[in-house]
Amino acid sequence: MRAKKRFGQNFLIDQNIINKIVDSSEVENRNIIEIGPGKGALTKILVKKANKVLAYEIDQDMVNILNQQISSKNFVLINKDFLKEEFDKSQNYNIVANIPYYITSDIIFKIIENHQIFDQATLMVQKEVALRILAKQNDSEFSKLSLSVQFFFDVFLICDVSKNSFRPIPKVDSAVIKLVKKKNKDFSLWKEYFEFLKIAFSSRRKTLLNNLKYFFNEQKILKFFELKNYDPKVRAQNIKNEDFYALFLELR
């Protein structure tokens, strides 16, 4: 069965990487959601260790293969787009996924939106995206994605993954990252906060003040900079994560 470009399919064939994903995912006796199981290389191990595996697969051809190959009683195959699912809030899950790169951000924001039921997620992502998610203050890759993910999750790099670990071979390397939900975080304003970050990073060449002043009170911004000892010409990528959220609360 050939991979389909429209679904962003690249099948993981490296057993060492598969084992690292499973070992880092804390799947033992847990409820697991797998996004895009494909031919089931990862799924076959998950069903042996997890309490229950819910696998979301939108490709009917892959669904047919999985139904033939996996008959475990704790395996539930759902022929549906994960992004369109309305989840039962009474259950808790860990997520494990080798996700299509073109919907990485969408999946992460779906996880944030459903934070009540997702404790952690182990994700295979494009190496470039992993660097952006893991980036720290003053890094060139530091972005709204870095801030939004790191505010709600502790983020860990599990391993780098060569493009040769997939078939067909993609053009870029990948990385496995793990997101662990932070305790006692207020998720209620996450959509509003992300809209704020989009404005803050709308032009990386401009100062943060110039990006924000047409939408928020300029004097409040300058007063905040003075309080936190930031230069008025500071750029968005040079602001600490916790200070960004404090500024957001001050201006909203």
Curated annotation (Swiss-Prot):
Main location: cytoplasm
Keyword annotations: Cytoplasm, Methyltransferase, RNA-binding, rRNA processing, S-adenosyl-L-methionine, Transferase
Coiled-coil residue spans: none
Transmembrane segments: none
GO cellular component: cytosol
InterPro entries: KsgA/Erm (IPR001737), rRNA_Ade_diMease-like_C (IPR023165), rRNA_Ade_Mease_Trfase_CS (IPR020596), rRNA_Ade_methylase_Trfase_N (IPR020598), rRNA_adenine_dimethylase (IPR011530), SAM-dependent_MTases_sf (IPR029063)
Reaction(s) this enzyme catalyzes, per UniProt: adenosine(1518)/adenosine(1519) in 16S rRNA + 4 S-adenosyl-L-methionine = N(6)-dimethyladenosine(1518)/N(6)-dimethyladenosine(1519) in 16S rRNA + 4 S-adenosyl-L-homocysteine + 4 H(+)
Domain of life: Bacteria
Enzyme Commission number(s): 2.1.1.182
Enzyme class: transferase
Single GO MF descriptor: 16S rRNA (adenine(1518)-N(6)/adenine(1519)-N(6))-dimethyltransferase activity
Record localization: Cytoplasm
Binding site for S-adenosyl-L-methionine: N10, L12, G36, E57, D81, N98
Stored NCBIfam families: ksgA (TIGR00755)
Task performed by this protein: Specifically dimethylates two adjacent adenosines (A1518 and A1519) in the loop of a conserved hairpin near the 3'-end of 16S rRNA in the 30S particle. May play a critical role in biogenesis of 30S subunits.
Family label: Belongs to the class I-like SAM-binding methyltransferase superfamily. rRNA adenine N(6)-methyltransferase family. RsmA subfamily.
Protein name: Ribosomal RNA small subunit methyltransferase A
Taxonomic source organism: Mycoplasmopsis pulmonis (strain UAB CTIP) (Mycoplasma pulmonis)
Gene: rsmA
